[in-house]
Amino acid sequence: MSHTFVDETKRAGYVIAAVTVTDTEAIRKVVRALVLPGQRRIHMKHEQARRRRVIVSALAAMQVQAIVYDAARRYRTDLAARTACLTAIVEDIAARDGDTRLVIEQDDSVVRADRHDLFQLVRQAGITDRIEYRHQRAYDELLLALPDIVAWSWVRSGEWRRRISPILTTVRTVDPRKREARAPRPSGRVSGSLPRS
């Protein structure tokens, strides 16, 4: 079973990063080693510049795959942008083989809406038997640091985007005027996918 970890940033419009991991134990050891004594988790917003470089370099060397879902400021509300990004994530999971555990960083203000959306999206995509999803706090699941690092790096552009490029497989522009921002068709066969493992 692969695990896909999801986090958002609103710094430069609405962006969600999804990082897929197959060997969670090996990657968790690497992330745990990056957490400083006294820290509960890695959160790029609170890290010093030198540490950020170390963290991003470590991520770029990991055996993981990242996708950025960039809704920018194309939606009237953050919730609408989030729903569109979750739609794209479910489409991508539906297009690949195997089972997936989707772990979303918990934001209490959107958990209820997420659960409602995911319930519908997963069923529409026809993958209820291949996916489980849950929300967790970043300090309870160390691997939620991965999408935080990717999202943080993506919105800062330049050097930071270059640093994450070894693991970045796709950047999806999520746009209400384009087909990919809509809910998946019942067959679950839609364009755009995560690389097959």
Predicted feature descriptions by range:
Residues 1-197:
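Phosphate-ester processing/binding pockets and catalytic centers
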